């Protein structure tokens, strides 16, 4: 999804220290996922709503069905993630969302909801590249990983 479609112009990400709380949104394909993370590594909540059953009879993900399901699920999943983390909007320092690559309709649901919260809460919106996020997720498990490194990154079906 490019900057023209999402309004997610490249910006400097907010400085993350051990107390920074980010609400992260992921809707690039067929799962609606929201997590609250403190300090870049401490996962306070992670809520995932799968659409596997919706797409099973088609033998793969149907983009329009995925987008409509995200539209129905995004607010309840966000609310549950905040509730499970014991947070509300005034506790959140930034809102991040996957901006691509992915299914355009699915991405727009997540980006729109995330940007709306960032605007309402007057906090930065951080655009996240889906593939880069897969790479950096390894640091959650092993924060001492060092560059340079060789990575095989496979995503999707």
Stretch-by-stretch model annotation:
Residues 1-157:
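Short acidic/glycine-rich loops and adjacent helix/strand connectors
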